[in-house]
């Protein structure tokens, strides 16, 4: 015999919507849940809206079951009083779900990383400067492999001196990607025709003395969540394998304007999670039986293997830091609101950030200079200067370090303590600091989970989530479904607590300009992604098996110049970033 809900034609998606409206999850009796589940895929054609249905009736018993999740015990009288309101609200929820909302539409509520009363932020009125490429004495390498591993800062002078051509570099990048991608699975699609056209144009312009930027003529790769007309933008998912977008991502437009040459769209973990996509698992060039980590998997792997001088990745929670660590490249996660996300897949509107992944901190600065700043299309972007030059000094910088994280037992402790000695050898006076720990920072992850579930809500409700690559407990399909049970009040409260966290972090960082931190030490990765602070992650040694470890430098809001200056000085003293994976050297 069907249950009352099943008898009213409740399908799985409507049922999830009903329960989430109540904040109902595990408290629901298992039999009721099982009875409500239809056969997957039987009643829905992808992309075709569902026919209107009469909303199911919420009963006092359902409210009673929901109280465990919402944390609010009620009396019978209170439940009876609520019933009409809750049922009326459910009708509205169903109406909202019938509206098709593209992934590119931002919520009306916008995150601002600058807390009230924040001090010493760069003045918007200051003149923005463009970095000079600098004079790096470089001769043309004798082998193609040596040429492939040169940095952006080294390639620029060679191009301008016409000791190498953009067409040669572009063909070298394409050849290496074709050769090594079967081992690395880092490429989704090559943009060969576009790249060769751009390279020929760059060579003509350079020969005439028209130098657009330090990136002119240099090949690069885009994480495949950036829209490029004429090529699929797959988001790493079989569901979007053929997706063609007409718009051009702002970072692509800006790198085009800088004269850089786009040669490939690079792998990302499906919907920007991990290193597994519909083509397989992207590999770490230092250990090819190991994943590259993610979700900026392809950008890290392709750069580390000498297939590309640089790439653009993204970070919501570790997606630049983690693969940069695993693959031994240098990554810059900018301040939230520094780089326009127009034309980029949205995962979390209040946490997504785009940034460069390169061979060095200097290269990150050269790329960041080309892509930062407002475009009138992403309303979260600030107009703030980036006053930085290659080989900027660190005189006068106040350097802090996360004392507790360095002293705690963790796998890279020996490397991290050695980093303290290097920093002291640079003549810096280190100030011990601690990020706040009194707030439930881990619980704030529901902000990311809820926003991600909203970004891909149609996939969950249509039942197409069973076509996604991974179906594990921590993979997106299950996370998206689970997020339906996050109460709206808790989501708002989490954001209010986030504001409290932002104020506390701002108070701590007023005492310093840059903070050294173990890349995954303590709660710094989650905390600074929630607050929107910038970070550079760079190689800091190698494990016995030859795989890299990393170190992070955290900055104040809009403090990328200071972070890059310290990172550049550190790399000048260590040179870990110059090592090459032996199989690709």
Segments (PLM) and residue ranges:
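C-terminal segment of N-terminal export signals and the immediately downstream linker at the start
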Residues: 9, 30-80, 84, 101-107, ...
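Short helix-loop capping/hinge segments that flank enzyme active sites or metal/cofactor-binding pockets
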Residues: 133-146, 215-235, 393-402, 447-502, ...
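N-terminal secretory signal peptides
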Residues: 1-10
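N-terminal export leaders
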Residues: 10-31
């Amino acid at each position: 015999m069907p249950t009352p809900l099943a008898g009213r034609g409740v399908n799985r998606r409507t049922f999830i919507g009903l329960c989430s409206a109540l904040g109902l999850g595990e408290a629901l009796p298992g039999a009721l849940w099982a009875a409500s589940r239809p056969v997957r895929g039987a009643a829905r054609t992808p992309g075709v809206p569902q026919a209107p249905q009469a909303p199911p009736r919420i009963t006092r018993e359902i409210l009673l079951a929901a109280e465990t999740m919402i944390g609010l015990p009620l009396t019978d009288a209170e439940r009876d009083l609520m019933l009409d309101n809750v049922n009326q609200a459910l009708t509205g929820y169903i109406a909202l779900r019938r509206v098709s909302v593209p992934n590119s539409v931002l919520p009306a509520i916008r995150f601002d990383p600058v807390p009230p009363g924040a001090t010493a932020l760069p003045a918007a009125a200051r003149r923005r400067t463009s970095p000079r490429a600098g004079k790096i004495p470089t001769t043309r390498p004798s082998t193609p492999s040596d040429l492939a591993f040169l940095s952006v800062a080294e390639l620029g002078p060679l191009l301008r001196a016409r000791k190498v051509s953009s067409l040669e570099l572009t063909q070298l990048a394409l050849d290496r990607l074709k050769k090594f991608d079967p081992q690395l699975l880092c490429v989704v699609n090559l943009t060969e025709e576009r790249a060769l056209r751009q390279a020929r144009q760059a060579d003509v312009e350079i020969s005439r003395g028209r130098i657009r930027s330090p990136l002119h003529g240099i090949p690069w790769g885009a994480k495949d969540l950036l829209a490029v007309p004429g090529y699929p933008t797959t988001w790493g998912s079989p569901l979007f394998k053929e997706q063609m977008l007409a718009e051009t991502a702002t970072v692509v437009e800006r790198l085009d304007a800088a004269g850089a040459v786009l040669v490939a769209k690079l792998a990302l973990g499906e919907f920007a999670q991990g290193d597994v996509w519909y083509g397989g698992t992207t590999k770490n060039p230092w250990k090819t039986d190991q994943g590259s980590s993610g979700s900026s998997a392809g950008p890290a792997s392709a750069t580390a293997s000498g297939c590309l001088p640089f790439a653009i990745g993204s970070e919501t929670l570790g997606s630049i830091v983690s693969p940069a660590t695993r693959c031994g490249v240098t990554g810059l996660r900018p301040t939230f609101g520094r780089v326009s996300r127009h034309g980029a897949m949205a995962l979390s509107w209040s946490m997504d950030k785009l940034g460069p992944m390169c061979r060095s901190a200097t290269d990150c600065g050269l790329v960041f200079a080309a892509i930062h700043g407002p475009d009138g299309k992403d309303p979260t972007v600030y107009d703030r200067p980036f006053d930085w030059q290659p080989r900027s000094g660190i005189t006068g910088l106040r350097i802090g370090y996360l004392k507790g994280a360095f002293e705690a037992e963790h796998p890279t402790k020996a490397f991290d303590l050695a980093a303290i000695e290097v920093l002291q050898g640079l003549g810096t006076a280190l100030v011990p600091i601690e990020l706040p720990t009194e707030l439930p920072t881990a619980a704030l992850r529901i902000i990311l989970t809820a926003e991600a579930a909203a970004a891909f809500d149609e996939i969950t409700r249509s039942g197409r989530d069973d076509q996604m690559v991974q179906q594990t407990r921590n993979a997106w399909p299950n996370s998206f479904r689970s997020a339906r049970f996050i109460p709206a009040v808790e989501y708002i409260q989490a954001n209010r607590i986030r504001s409290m966290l932002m104020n506390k972090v701002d108070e701590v960082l007023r005492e310093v300009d840059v903070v050294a931190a173990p890349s995954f030490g303590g709660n710094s990765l989650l905390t600074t992604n929630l607050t929107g602070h910038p970070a550079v992650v760079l190689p800091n040694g190698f494990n016995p098996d030859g795989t890299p470890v990393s170190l992070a430098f955290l900055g104040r809001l809009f403090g990328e110049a200071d972070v890059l200056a310290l990172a550049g000085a550190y790399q000048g003293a260590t040179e870990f970033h110059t090592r090459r994976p032996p199989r690709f050297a």
